[in-house]
Amino acid sequence: MIKNPKVLILTAHYGNGHVQVAKTLEQAFHQKGIEDVIVCDLFGESHPVITDITKYLYLKSYTIGKELYRLFYYGVEKIYDKKIASWYANFGRKRLKALLHTEKPDIVINTFPIIAVPELKKQTGFSIPVYNVLTDFCLHKIWIHREVDRYFVATDHVKQVMIEIGVPAERIVETGIPIRKNFELTMNSELIYNKYQLSREKKILLIVAGAHGVLGNVKDLCASFMSVPNLQVAVVCGKNDALKQELLKLQEQNSEALKVFGYIENIDELFRVTSCMITKPGGITLSEAAALQVPVILYKPVPGQENENAIYFESKGAAVVIREDAEIFEKTKALLEDDRKLLQMKEAMGSIYRPEPAAHIVDVILEENHAQTNHVPMKSPALAQSFT
C-alpha cells in the first residue's frame, strides 16, 4: 500500500480548460487526503517561446486561422503515427526527466495530450502508472499510447471509438470530464436572481463572450436581442475589458434588457438561471452546461475538437449549432419561444452528464495504486503512441 502518494499532473495553457481540469483533479485528491499534488505546465516550462507562439496561433484559430487549424487537427490525425510522433514525443522531455528525478512522483496524470511520459516509460522501462484524462467529447489519436495505463473519457461514444482503433476496453473508464465542484452543488435560485438583478418572470439568454474575442459581433447581437420582449440578455466578457466597456455603453440604453459582466468566478450561478446559452463548444464548458442541464447554442465551432464536440451534442439533441452569422438571431429567438424544445434539450443535457467525474477518476487511480487515504469533508463554496 502506498501511503501519501505523490501525484504529478501535467497540463498546458491552450485555452483554460486543460488547466482547469488539472486543478479540479488536484482539489479532488486533496479531498481524499492526498496533499502532495504537483500541477505542471510541461510545455510552457520547457519551451516558453515556442509555447507562446503556438498559444497565439491557437487563439487566432477562432478568427483568421480556421483553415490552418483544420489542416493541423485533421492532418496530424492522419499522419501522426508516421511523422509527428517522434518529434512530439520528445517535446518537453528534458524538463520531464528533471521533474521525475527531483519530485519522484508515484502517479502521473495528463490533462493535455502529452506523450513524453509514456514514451519515456517505453524507452527507459521505468515503472510509473500513467493516466490520460481526455477533455473533449471526441478522440484525437495523439492521446493514445501503449504505455498509458488508463484513459478516462467523457462518454461511451469516445470509449467505443478507442476500442475500434485497438485500445483494450479494460483500459478505458467512462467518467465524464472533471468540472468545478460549484457545478455539482444545489443553490437557491432566488439569491442568484437578486444578486445579478435578473427577473424570474423573463427568459434569460446567457452569452459567454470570453476573453479572447472568440464570439464575433457581440455588440450587434446584444442590440438585436434587446428588442425582444420579455427577454433579458446576460453577457459575460471574461477578462476582455475592451468588450465590457463597449457593451456597458449599450447597456445604458436599456439596463433592464441587457446585463454586462466581466470575469465571474462563480459563473455556475448564471448557468442555473439561464434559459439557454450561446457559447463555444469547448469540452469543459459543455460538461458544465450538461451538469446544470443548460440548453446551448454553439456558435461557429472551429474545425477540430470544437466542431466534433458540437456535432456530438447536436446529434444528442442537446445543442443547436450555428455556422453562419445571419442565422444566429432568428434561430436563437425561435428556440427561446419554443418551451417544448428547450425542455427536450435540458433532458438531453441531463442524459450526457456523468456525476462527480473528478471524484470517480481519483477513486479509480487510488484504488489501482492501493493508496492509503484520509477523507477530508468538503465545505460548500459560498454563493458569490498507437495500438494500430
Swiss-Prot record:
Reactions this protein catalyses: a 1,2-diacyl-3-O-(beta-D-glucopyranosyl)-sn-glycerol + UDP-alpha-D-glucose = a 1,2-diacyl-3-O-(beta-D-Glc-(1->6)-beta-D-Glc)-sn-glycerol + UDP + H(+); a 1,2-diacyl-3-O-(beta-D-Glc-(1->6)-beta-D-Glc)-sn-glycerol + UDP-alpha-D-glucose = a 1,2-diacyl-3-O-(beta-D-Glc-(1->6)-beta-D-Glc-(1->6)-beta-D-Glc)-sn-glycerol + UDP + H(+); a 1,2-diacyl-sn-glycerol + UDP-alpha-D-glucose = a 1,2-diacyl-3-O-(beta-D-glucopyranosyl)-sn-glycerol + UDP + H(+)
GO molecular function, one term: 1,2-diacylglycerol 3-glucosyltransferase activity
GO biological process: enterobacterial common antigen biosynthetic process; glycolipid biosynthetic process; lipoteichoic acid biosynthetic process
Enzyme class at the top of the EC tree: transferase
EC number(s) given by UniProt: 2.4.1.315
Key words of the record: Carbohydrate metabolism, Cell membrane, Glycosyltransferase, Lipid biosynthesis, Lipid metabolism, Membrane, Transferase
Record-level GO cellular component terms: plasma membrane
InterPro entries, sorted: Diacylglyc_glucosyltr_N, Glyco_trans_28_C, Glycosyltransf_28_UgtP, Pro_diacylglycrl_glcsylTrfase
Pathway: Glycolipid metabolism; diglucosyl-diacylglycerol biosynthesis
Coarse class of the protein's main subcellular location: membrane
Disulfide bonds: none
KW Transferase (keyword) present: yes
Location(s), subcellular: Cell membrane
Function: Processive glucosyltransferase involved in the biosynthesis of both the bilayer- and non-bilayer-forming membrane glucolipids. Is able to successively transfer up to three glucosyl residues to diacylglycerol (DAG), thereby catalyzing the formation of beta-monoglucosyl-DAG (3-O-(beta-D-glucopyranosyl)-1,2-diacyl-sn-glycerol), beta-diglucosyl-DAG (3-O-(beta-D-glucopyranosyl-beta-(1->6)-D-glucopyranosyl)-1,2-diacyl-sn-glycerol) and beta-triglucosyl-DAG (3-O-(beta-D-glucopyranosyl-beta-(1->6)-D-glucopyranosyl-beta-(1->6)-D-glucopyranosyl)-1,2-diacyl-sn-glycerol).
The family this protein is said to belong to: Belongs to the glycosyltransferase 28 family. UgtP subfamily.
Listed name of the protein: Processive diacylglycerol beta-glucosyltransferase
Organism whose genome encodes this protein: Bacillus cytotoxicus (strain DSM 22905 / CIP 110041 / 391-98 / NVH 391-98)
Gene: ugtP
